[in-house]
């Protein structure tokens, strides 16, 4: 009895270590804003904390494929856990970004040795080899899904260093188990890999798994960046929101294990792609829309990854090679997804940032504030708007409240709404790209999964039909709530076009009209709108004084402005 309990404890400790190694692919995402502040780096530099781990883990797993026949799984797990434990502690003590990236690379190497060697051990410790494969896959899916939420919770409650320190005790306990493990028997002939169709199915399943993993970048990384950097949620709140992914994954994963068919896997792909499309067409800054989209993506994750992993591992024998291929496929997919999405996101945010500056400047110039106040505000906020979105959007409500202006007009809330809507739309192409990567997984897994009988195929069409219905319902609801207009290109007046006069009566309204008409006259001379002129002057380092004096008197003093206007 005690031996059986010890065996079970060893199994669950090893599975927990496997889950942590998979979770590390995304566990630091919610800590990236803290790392940006701690090290004063760019988002490109800090992103290597994520990329280094996944890249080294994927490449090391590929190398271990060719060493599979010579690799002793017990030694692989022991060395892997020792490296993972040491690197986790070192990451928590990192003194700069370079050292953190270096230690994350070592952690990735340890993770590769652990994951590749753990599969044969789990097969032997479980009640049956088949159950061992199921548990190993489940640990990987759970770890991948829980990673962002767990990292966000630790970052908010303690610090980003706690994300790494928390992994050390578990790795140490698993290392003790691995050191006590005995050499198992050689696999029976029935467990050894079979050539031909089985190999082709394994290859197809791993290719499909890589594409699905690339799509997961949308829910594991993009969603977190949107919630923290653009919508300004705390890491703890963001962790609660993204927990919709593991919750729905847990619910559907048992179904995926029991029913492995093309139709079920297709339903998972459609659900994953639909969740990403839902994130691409968010109609408002609303947690409910994000939860609905992430829940749908979580359902897809819980179906696709276990189904494809079972096929990839079941036909490859009992050694370390099947696990190596599986781990490599998943993490190469993540790295490829990051490489594809990063330039799309950078471009989208840059483009929307320019639009947001013009639209916010227009709102400031049209606000019922004194000319002096609105110009000072427009020029002072221009550098803030020019700051990269990766460093987080400013809180305009607080900025304006500190200046004791615009409270009655709701200008701060209006600026927040304008800028957040614009930058949210900047994620659209990235989400659509990840959704397309997910749909491409349909091609290879058509060869990986059995088609079944004609009767079973007709009956099985219900699963993908249900997924498509859920996708259509979500996208239709978002469209009805204005998804296509949310954050769209602002309708600004063309240079020299006639504009509506400033509303109101009395001396103040007359002064406003005169000032804005003069501003339009100057802007027209340079073939710009008034918003483009103010943004351009602020970008050149001008202040509002010269422009304010010109507007207050209603005459164009070209010589006073020549210093700045000549640069336009």
Question: Can you describe what each PLM-predicted range is?
Answer:
Residues 2-14, 27, 37, 62-76, ...:
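Surface-exposed, interaction-prone regions with an acidic/low-complexity signature
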Residues 2-10, 214, 372-468:
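Transmembrane-helix exit segments and adjacent C-terminal regions of multi-pass membrane proteins
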Residues 6-32, 40-65, 69-77, 81-87, ...:
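12-transmembrane solute porter fold
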Residues 54-187:
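Helix-loop-helix hairpins in multi-pass membrane proteins, especially solute transporters
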Residues 156-157, 282-283, 343-356, 450-452, ...:
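C-terminal region of N-terminal signal peptides and the immediate post-cleavage residues
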Residues 183-195, 228:
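Phenylalanine-glycine-rich, low-complexity intrinsically disordered regions
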Residues 269-271, 349-382, 522-525:
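Juxtamembrane non-transmembrane segments of integral membrane proteins
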């Amino acid at each position: 009895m005690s031996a059986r309990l010890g065996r079970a404890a060893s199994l669950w400790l090893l599975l927990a270590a496997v889950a942590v190694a998979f979770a590390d692919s995304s566990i630091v995402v919610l800590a990236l804003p803290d790392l940006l502040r701690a090290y004063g780096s760019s988002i490109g530099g800090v992103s290597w904390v994520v990329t280094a781990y996944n890249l080294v883990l994927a490449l090391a797993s590929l190398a271990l494929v060719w060493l599979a026949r010579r690799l002793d799984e017990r030694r692989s797990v022991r060395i892997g856990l020792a490296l993972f434990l040491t690197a986790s502690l070192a990451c928590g003590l990192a003194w700069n970004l370079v050292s953190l990236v270096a230690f994350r690379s070592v952690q990735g190497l340890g993770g590769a040795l652990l994951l590749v060697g753990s599969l044969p051990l789990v097969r032997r410790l479980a009640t049956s080899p088949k159950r061992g494969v199921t548990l190993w896959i489940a640990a990987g899916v759970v770890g991948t899904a829980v990673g962002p939420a767990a990292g966000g919770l630790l970052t908010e409650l303690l610090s980003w260093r706690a994300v790494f320190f928390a992994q050390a005790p578990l790795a140490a306990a698993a290392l003790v188990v691995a050191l006590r493990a005995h050499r198992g028997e050689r696999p029976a002939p029935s467990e050894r890999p079979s050539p031909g169709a089985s190999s082709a199915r394994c290859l197809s399943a791993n290719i499909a798994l890589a594409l699905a993993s690339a799509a997961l970048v949308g829910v594991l990384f993009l969603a977190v960046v949107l919630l923290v950097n653009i919508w300004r949620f705390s890491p703890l709140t963001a962790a609660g929101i993204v927990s919709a992914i593991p919750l729905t994954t847990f619910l559907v994963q048992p179904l995926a294990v029991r029913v492995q068919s093309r139709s079920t896997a297709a339903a998972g792909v459609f659900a994953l792609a639909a969740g990403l499309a839902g994130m691409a067409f968010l109609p408002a800054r609303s947690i409910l829309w994000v939860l609905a989209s992430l829940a749908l993506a979580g359902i897809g994750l819980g179906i696709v990854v276990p189904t494809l992993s079972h096929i990839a591992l079941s036909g490859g024998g009992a050694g370390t090679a099947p696990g190596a291929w599986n781990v490599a496929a998943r993490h190469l997919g993540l790295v490829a997804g990051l490489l594809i999405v990063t330039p799309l996101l950078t471009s989208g945010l840059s483009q929307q940032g320019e639009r947001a500056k013009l639209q916010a400047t227009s709102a400031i110039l049209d606000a019922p504030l004194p000319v002096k106040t609105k110009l000072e505000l427009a020029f002072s906020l221009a550098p803030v708007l020019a700051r990269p979105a990766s460093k987080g959007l400013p809180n305009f409500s607080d900025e304006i409240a500190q200046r004791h202006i615009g409270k009655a007009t709701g200008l701060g809330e209006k600026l927040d709404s304008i800028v957040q809507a614009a930058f949210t739309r900047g994620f659209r192409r990235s989400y659509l790209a990840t959704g397309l990567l997910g749909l491409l997984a349909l091609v290879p897994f058509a060869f990986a999964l059995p088609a079944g009988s004609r009767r079973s195929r007709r009956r099985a069409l219900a699963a993908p039909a249900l997924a498509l219905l859920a996708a259509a319902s979500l996208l239709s609801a978002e469209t009805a709530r204005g998804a296509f207009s949310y954050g769209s290109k602002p309708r600004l007046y063309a240079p020299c076009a006639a504009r509506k006069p400033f509303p109101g009566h009395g001396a103040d309204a007359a002064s406003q009209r005169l000032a804005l008409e003069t501003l339009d006259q100057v802007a027209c001379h340079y073939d710009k709108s008034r918003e483009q002129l103010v943004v351009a002057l602020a970008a050149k380092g001008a202040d509002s004084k010269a422009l304010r004096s010109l507007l207050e008197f209603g005459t164009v003093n070209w010589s006073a402005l020549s210093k700045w206007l000549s640069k336009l």
